[in-house]
């Protein structure tokens, strides 16, 4: 699986076991991702942070 780094078009190949790409947003600025990368389990959203996860190449 290949996931984008914080600034596309840069990307990295995910290590074994991290089979999701994710984007993390602050709820106050939903248009600007704060973090991107590979993750094993999609974290739960909170009052301040929203996560978007997906399992195809460079989908984040």
UniProtKB/Swiss-Prot annotation:
Disulfide bonds: 3-21, 14-38, 42-53, 54-59
Cellular localisation: Secreted; Target cell membrane
Keywords attached to this entry: Cardiotoxin, Cytolysis, Disulfide bond, Membrane, Secreted, Target cell membrane, Target membrane, Toxin
Species this protein is from: Naja annulifera
CDD domains: TFP_snake_toxin (cd00206)
Any one of the GO CC terms: membrane
Pfam families reported for this sequence: Toxin_cobra-type (PF21947)
Record-stated family: Belongs to the three-finger toxin family. Short-chain subfamily. Type IA cytotoxin sub-subfamily.
Annotated protein name in UniProt: Cytotoxin 8
InterPro entries membership: Cytotoxin_Cobra, Snake_3FTx, Snake_toxin-like_sf, Snake_toxin_con_site, Toxin_cobra-type
Role played: Shows cytolytic activity on many different cells by forming pore in lipid membranes. In vivo, increases heart rate or kills the animal by cardiac arrest. In addition, it binds to heparin with high affinity, interacts with Kv channel-interacting protein 1 (KCNIP1) in a calcium-independent manner, and binds to integrin alpha-V/beta-3 (ITGAV/ITGB3) with moderate affinity.
Membrane recorded as keyword: yes
One GO process term, biological-process aspect: killing of cells of another organism
Major location (coarse): secreted
Tissue spec. comment: Expressed by the venom gland.
Record carries keyword Membrane: yes
Molecular function GO terms recorded: toxin activity
Oligomeric form and interacting partners: Monomer in solution; Homodimer and oligomer in the presence of negatively charged lipids forming a pore with a size ranging between 20 and 30 Angstroms.
């Amino acid at each position: 699986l290949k996931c984008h780094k914080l600034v596309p078009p840069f990307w990295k190949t995910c290590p074994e076991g991290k089979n999701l790409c994710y984007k993390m947003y602050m709820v106050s600025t939903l248009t600007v991702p704060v973090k991107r990368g590979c993750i094993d389990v999609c974290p739960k959203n909170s009052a301040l942070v929203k996560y978007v996860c997906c399992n195809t190449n460079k989908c984040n």
